[in-house]
């Protein structure tokens, strides 16, 4: 064994599937002087990888996760660690059959072979299934079982053989040292290692390790119950590790997977059970391993009964092994990847399951090497997506409790969270609530999607509102949205845009910095704006936003609620360090109203004044893309002539404390034109379609 090092280019903490594959990919990309440590023994240090069910169902409605899963499966195949056995998801009710039709669409979109089966066809592939209680199945021939421990071992050993990696098991992290906001060293029970980069890839322990550096990885260890049931005669006679397709009993949130002569039964139907990272036992104190806790039998019994109903032979066998296995859950059920927001060069590769482990390791390695990954766009997994309130334990537990039992659930793409609501309200909230707003969540903001007060407009426009006949299409939707669209197109509407994020850049190098960050030329006249993409280091598209030039050395970036965290991090990460550019997040200080429609100008002309005189709002004096500081009924505001909804109008910014006065003033001025509040269903969907920005 090598002598414990005092310096390294990169320290990877964790030797599960992610950490092992990561060191392998880093070595392949030319990284040298890598050190990998884990507090447990090798090859199984005691994390979730050691007890995982090790199967891959590639179809996912989320493109990012589907691509990462397919990339992982390719790597398992290349290493000879993939056993293709096929998989069938079975339906017990008509709603699930409808979901299978939607899954067929996703499978075709990602190039995954799949087919719908009748109960009899399911029986042909899985002869011991009770076909009388199912209505059909979703069959994916490429579903496979993998050996994640051996895969990780091969990747780790390959990096060692290349001469680029030193590995130290039974090495516990005691502290992470940070200097001037940048990671400096890892302190272990074997010594201190100075490091340029540190990656936290230690699964359920990741939050505890990150907090040593003052960083936050928002996840919780959660229980997933599983049991090995056997011996079972028909499985023993197959003389194979996996001879039959894996079955996912979707409506009971269970799965059945052959393991030689036994059947592994796993469940996501029990209550959500969380373990704090600090309460996970050590290897020495664990009967099996730190992440294999004793089964809570009462939670598992109902699920076992349902499994026996589907496969009667399970009732004649014994439970040989059963655990409350720990895995990682995040508030939005997505991985947590990328450089931490709080500490430079401290990276997260956490909340990753076996099916996407090697692919995510490749993605993170590329990200660290090139500044952005080549494999796929990691927007949904980027750690910088989280706002501060979303990283609290209260939020993490509430959201994870809500979505745990939806692991195999039928989740509508517009379905809203029930927990952790009313975290962020605009000053217009009382008026919106009085108007019967249906609120959707936008990173904690309560945003009106449509208003019950506009229901009468549905009758006015009748069939033009295009009612949706299919129940699924009509979920989390209302014809009021289309009525609001038509009303704004005829007259005028006002939209709450307070969920926008606004970042001010000031200082002598503000313009130079933004020129570097943005594609389009930001050196426009004061009082003008620029709509521009942000690119990755390789020239890929990272995002788009608007920049207002408020003064010679004062620019305001405006971006959306769902991109604000990522854009905030991206700008701050690339800012000069000598103080020539000052970044100020104005998002909690400003509120925004959009006013659009043919009568928007007439409405605002009643109440907008300049410096003690009537202000000319005409297109000649106030052209598209122009920015002006004005008074609106005495309220200091910034008006920006812009439209993403196909109608003339403005975004209007003011301080939060002036917001309610501004709303009431605009509503009163527009009463003559029957002004209405308009929801995000118009602004974010139908209006944008009509505008057709290209």
Predicted segments, located by residue:
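Central helical "cap/lid" subdomain
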Residues: 188-243, 375, 659, 677
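Dinucleotide-binding Rossmann-like beta1-alpha1 core, especially the glycine-rich loop
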Residues: 52-125, 251-256, 260-264, 274, ...
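Glycine/proline-enriched, intrinsically flexible loops and inter-domain linkers
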Residues: 376, 386-694
């Amino acid at each position: 064994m090598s002598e414990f090092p005092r310096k390294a280019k990169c320290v990877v903490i964790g030797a599960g599937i992610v950490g092992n594959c990561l060191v392998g990919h880093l070595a392949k990309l030319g990284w040298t002087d890598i050190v990998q440590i884990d507090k447990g023994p090798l090859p199984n240090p005691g994390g979730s990888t050691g007890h995982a069910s090790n199967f891959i169902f590639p179809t996912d409605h989320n493109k990012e996760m589907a691509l990462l899963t397919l990339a992982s499966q390719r790597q398992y195949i290349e290493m000879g660690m993939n056993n293709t056995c096929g998989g069938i998801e079975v339906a017990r009710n008509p709603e699930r059959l409808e979901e299978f039709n939607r899954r067929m669409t996703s499978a075709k979109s990602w190039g995954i072979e799949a087919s719908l089966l009748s109960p009899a066809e399911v029986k042909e592939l899985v002869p011991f299934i009770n076909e009388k209680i199912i209505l059909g199945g979703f069959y994916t021939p490429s579903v496979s079982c993998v050996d994640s421990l051996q895969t990780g071992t091969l990747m780790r050993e390959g990096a060692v053989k290349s001469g680029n990696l030193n590995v130290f098991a039974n090495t516990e992290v005691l502290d992470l040292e940070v200097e001037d906001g940048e990671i400096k060293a890892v302190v272990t029970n074997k010594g201190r290692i100075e490091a340029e980069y540190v990656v936290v890839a230690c699964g359920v322990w990741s939050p505890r390790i990150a907090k040593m550096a003052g960083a936050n990885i928002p996840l919780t260890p959660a229980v997933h119950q599983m049991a090995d049931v056997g011996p079972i005669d028909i499985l023993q006679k197959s003389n194979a590790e996996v001879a039959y397709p894996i079955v996912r009993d979707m409506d009971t949130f269970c799965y059945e997977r052959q393991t030689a002569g036994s059947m592994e039964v796993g469940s996501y139907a029990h209550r959500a059970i969380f373990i704090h990272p600090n309460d996970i036992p050590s290897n020495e104190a664990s009967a099996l391993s730190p992440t294999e806790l004793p089964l809570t039998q009462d939670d598992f019994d109902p699920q076992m009964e349902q499994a026996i109903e589907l496969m009667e032979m399970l009732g004649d066998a014994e439970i040989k092994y059963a655990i409350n296995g720990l895995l990682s859950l995040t508030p939005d059920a997505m991985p947590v990847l990328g450089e931490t927001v709080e500490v430079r060069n401290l990276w997260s590769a956490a909340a990753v399951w076996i099916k996407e482990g090697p692919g995510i390791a490749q993605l993170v390695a590329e990200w660290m090497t090139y500044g952005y990954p080549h494999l796929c766009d990691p927007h949904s997994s980027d750690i910088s997506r989280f706002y501060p309130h979303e990283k609290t334990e209260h939020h993490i537990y509430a959201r994870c409790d809500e979505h745990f039992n939806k692991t195999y659930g039928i989740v509508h793409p517009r379905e809203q969270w029930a927990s952790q609501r009313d975290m962020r309200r605009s000053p217009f909230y009382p008026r919106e609530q009085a108007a019967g707003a249906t609120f959707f969540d936008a990173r904690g903001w309560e945003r009106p999607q449509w208003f019950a007060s506009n229901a009468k407009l549905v009758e006015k426009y009748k069939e033009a509102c295009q009612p949706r006949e299919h129940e699924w299409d009509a979920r989390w939707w209302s014809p009021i949205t289309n009525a609001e669209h038509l009303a704004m197109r005829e007259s005028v509407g006002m939209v709450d845009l307070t969920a926008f994020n606004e970042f001010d850049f000031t200082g002598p190098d503000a313009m130079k910095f933004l020129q570097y960050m943005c594609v389009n030329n930001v050196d426009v006249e004061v009082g003008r704006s620029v709509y521009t993409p942000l690119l990755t280091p390789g020239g890929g598209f990272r995002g788009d936003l608007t920049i207002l030039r408020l003064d010679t050395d004062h620019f305001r970036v405006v971006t959306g609620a769902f991109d604000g965290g990522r854009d905030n991090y991206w700008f701050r990460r690339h800012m000069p360090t000598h103080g020539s550019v000052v970044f100020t997040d104005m998002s909690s200080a400003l509120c925004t109203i959009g006013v659009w429609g043919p009568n928007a100008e007439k409405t605002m002309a009643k109440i907008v004044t300049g410096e003690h005189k009537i202000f000319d709002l005409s297109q000649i004096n106030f052209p598209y893309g122009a920015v002006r500081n004005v008074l609106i009924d005495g309220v200091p505001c910034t008006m920006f002539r812009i439209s993403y909804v196909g109608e003339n109008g403005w975004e209007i910014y003011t301080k939060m404390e002036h917001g309610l006065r501004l709303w009431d003033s605009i509503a009163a001025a527009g009463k003559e034109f029957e002004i209405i509040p308009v929801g995000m269903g118009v602004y974010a969907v139908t209006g944008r379609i009509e505008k057709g920005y290209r």
